[in-house]
Swiss-Prot record:
Its EC number is 6.1.1.14. Keywords: Aminoacyl-tRNA synthetase, ATP-binding, Cytoplasm, Ligase, Nucleotide-binding, Protein biosynthesis. One of its GO terms (molecular function) is glycine-tRNA ligase activity. It comes from Pasteurella multocida (strain Pm70). Belongs to the class-II aminoacyl-tRNA synthetase family. Tetramer of two alpha and two beta subunits. It is found in: Cytoplasm. HAMAP family: Gly_tRNA_synth_beta. It catalyses: tRNA(Gly) + glycine + ATP = glycyl-tRNA(Gly) + AMP + diphosphate. It is an enzyme of class 6 (ligase). This is Glycine--tRNA ligase beta subunit. GO terms for cellular component: cytosol. InterPro entries: DALR_anticod-bd (IPR008909), Gly-tRNA-synth_bsu (IPR015944), Gly-tRNA-synth_heterodimer (IPR006194).
């Protein structure tokens, strides 16, 4: 089998930096799918992405499809010919579909009779004849939310396309894609290297592009270079660069030939909280801040230029000039905000709606204040501090700093509260109320902050569900899924003794007559329990384990978690499968019983040895496990219940449950009812697969 490397590059206007990597990886994945569907062998698919190009390179691609042997079975011989031996219409129709006559068909004998069959060899097509359509299909499936048209073309893409290059080895694959004919022309850097040049062989990519066009097409190479040089620059300045991966990806997507440089700003700006300075450096300017070994911000930053002059001083000065007004703004906002106490912003919250039916932000802070106090009492936090933090929780939203730099909400509240002389736990809670902000984010550290964070999240959940605006489909404008999961994480990971139903009930009472959904408590609890499913599935816990616990609907998250861990452990035991099947059988038997199920076991009515053994063990375990269930030690309890496998199997092998004697029958049903209830103290294990 002969192979060649294949290159496909699409040259465009500047692509959206936050989407570049996703587009490139999707292009490669789509191309792999096309190749596999065509039955073409290849070694691997590499992807390349720069601000003005997307490319894939298929290594060791077979130059033709393999031949395929096909076999199409037709009607049975008995149905293919009539009494006179002439082909029936069914046989003729099948043969016509195969492109043959009935006489050309072969016959195959099976244990079900003799059948007509058509066997043929389909020759594979040359790969070069297939590639243009494959590339077009791969591009058409890219995740582009808002494609655009340009010039007088009718085609659409994420940005205007200027060049298309497709090479199989040294052969140009001709054809039009996105309104542009495939050619050997590559475009280089806008300001460095050659503007246009020719590529003669796929193997020259991407080295030729770097050599002649001053473009590093490999995204990961650019990213690694930026990271290494940034760390090197920061070390030279006696610090450590703050390089988040998302920002690094974005910066990598903005430059074709990265030149990493360091610049500085005036030390006077360090009097402003570092978070505000970092917000504008990272968010607006795409700079990397530098911290000293103690985590304090240094008056330096790192930026990445797309040009590489002999003297970079002008570029450095230019970036310093660009950032200075933004830092000056932050300084001004900070000094202006300090002229008022945080508490003085409370009246202004009355001018901002939280939600039309639910009132203003001032209404929300009043509810958070009360609910945070209630939660604090239950979890052992300082109630006074929790209520104070709840009262001040949204005041920083009215400050100049947060109005201009929105991502500093919370953290600026903390700084302003400290300046006002508020208790440190209160100040920190103003920042930590929003935690966790995203999946995997850290949780509030103190119990006071946890109380405020939970109060804020439950207020939003209860309010929005209370007016019937719960999430539908993928739409979630109030981020209720994130709020629910965040609340669950705080309760579970901090092992807080809170009941979802109780908190939602208290929260709903604080809304007065604003809520219109009479089932708000049940709806919010159901929604939050549903979030558990997503959480545990992400952890790799089996769906049937989660369903087994959900069937019992425990509303204390810490208790729910303990049950899931216990059932997951139990599921791996040797006895689990048999006991799950037995519980399913017990459930089916008891479901057919009319009226109230018998509750009390009478061992004197046990006529068979097997039922007496099981009855005695069930009674003994009820007494033994009651304190374990009360303490939530479910794993230990299930380990003990696993010992019932043998007596349960023996019972079903030797005892007729539905005995003719009504006393025997009722007693046997009581044994099974009590057996099932032991397991139901943890979960419905009959749902385990």
């Amino acid at each position: 089998m002969t192979t060649q490397n294949f290159l496909a590059e699409i040259g465009t206007e500047e692509l959206p930096p936050k989407a570049l990597k996703k587009l490139a990886t999707a292009f490669a994945e789509n191309m792999e799918l096309e190749l596999n569907q065509a039955g073409l062998a290849f070694e691997s698919v590499q992807w390349f992405a720069a601000p003005r190009r997307l490319a894939v390179k298929v290594l060791a691609l077979a130059t033709s499809q393999p031949s395929k042997e096909i076999e199409k079975r037709g009607p049975a011989v008995s149905a293919a010919f009539d009494a006179e031996g002439k082909p029936t219409k069914a046989a003729e129709g099948w043969a016509r579909g195969c492109g043959i006559s009935v006489e050309q068909a072969e016959r195959v004998a099976t244990d079900k009779g003799e059948w007509l069959v058509h066997r043929a060899t389909i020759e594979g097509q040359p790969t070069k004849n297939l590639l243009k359509d494959m590339v077009a299909n791969a591009l058409a499936k890219l995740p582009i939310p808002k494609p655009m048209r340009w010039a007088d073309k009718t085609v659409q893409f994420i940005r205007p396309v200027h060049t298309v290059t497709m090479l199989l080895g040294d052969e140009l694959i001709e054809g039009e894609i996105l309104g542009v004919e495939s050619a050997r022309t590559l475009r280089g850097h806008r300001f460095l290297g050659e503007r246009e040049f020719q590529i003669s062989h796929a193997d020259q990519y991407p080295a030729l592009l770097k050599e002649k066009g001053s473009v590093v097409a490999d995204f990961n190479d650019r990213k690694a270079l930026i990271l290494a040089k940034s760390q090197e620059k920061a070390t030279a300045l006696g610090g450590v660069a703050d390089i988040e991966d998302d920002l690094l990806d974005e910066v990598t997507s903005l430059v074709e030939y990265p030149n990493v440089l360091a610049a500085k700003f005036e030390e006077r700006f360090l009097a402003v909280p570092a978070e505000a300075l970092v917000y504008t450096m990272k968010g607006d300017q795409k700079y990397f801040p530098i911290y000293d070994k103690d985590g304090k911000l240094l008056p330096h930053f790192i930026f990445v230029s797309n040009i590489n002059p002999d003297d970079p001083s002008k570029i450095i000065e230019g970036n310093e000039k660009v950032v200075r007004p933004r830092l000056t703004d932050a300084e001004f906002f900070f000094k202006t905000d300090l002229k008022q106490r945080l508490e003085d912003q409370l009246p202004r919250l009355e001018t901002v709606l939280f939600q039309q039916q639910l009132g203003t932000l001032r209404d929300k802070t009043a509810r958070i204040e009360q609910l945070a106090g209630e939660i604090a009492k239950q979890i052992g936090a300082d109630e006074v501090k929790a209520k104070r933090a709840g009262l001040l929780s949204k005041c920083d939203l009215m400050t100049n700093m947060v109005f201009e730099f929105t991502d500093t909400q919370g953290v600026m509240g903390m700084h302003y509260a400290r300046h006002d002389g508020e208790d440190e736990e209160v100040a920190v809670a103003l920042n930590e109320q929003y935690m966790p902000r995203f999946a995997g984010d850290e949780l509030p550290k103190s119990l006071v902050a946890s109380a405020v964070a939970l109060a804020d999240k439950f207020d939003t959940l209860t309010g929005i569900f209370g007016i019937g605006q719960q999430p539908k489909g993928s739409a979630d404008p109030f981020a209720l899924r994130r709020a629910a999961l965040g609340a669950l994480r705080i309760i579970v990971e901090k092992n807080l003794p809170l009941d979802l139903a109780e908190i939602v009930k208290k929260s709903s009472a604080l809304f007065g007559d604003k809520l219109t959904n009479a089932n708000v408590v049940e709806d919010v609890v159901e929604f939050m329990l549903g979030r558990f499913r997503a959480w545990y599935q992400d952890e790799g816990i089996a769906v049937d384990v989660i369903q087994a616990v959900l069937a019992r609907r425990p509303t204390k998250p810490s208790d729910f978690d303990a049950r899931v861990r216990a059932v997951s452990h139990f599921r791996a035991l040797e006895a689990a499968e048999a006991l799950a099947a037995a519980n399913k059988r017990v459930s089916n038997i008891l479901a057919k019983v009319e009226g109230e199920l018998p509750a009390n076991i009478d061992t004197t009515l046990c006529a068979e040895a097997a039922e007496k053994v099981l009855a005695e063990q069930v009674i003994a375990l009820q007494a033994e496990l009651a304190p374990l269930f009360a303490k939530g030690e479910y794993q230990v309890a299930l380990d003990r219940l696993a010992a019932l496998r043998e007596p349960v199997d023996t019972f079903f092998d030797n005892v007729m449950v539905n005995a003719e004697n009504p006393q025997l029958r009722q007693n046997r049903l009581a044994i099974l009812n009590n057996l099932r209830n032991l397991f139901l103290q943890v979960a419905d294990i009959s749902l385990l697969q």
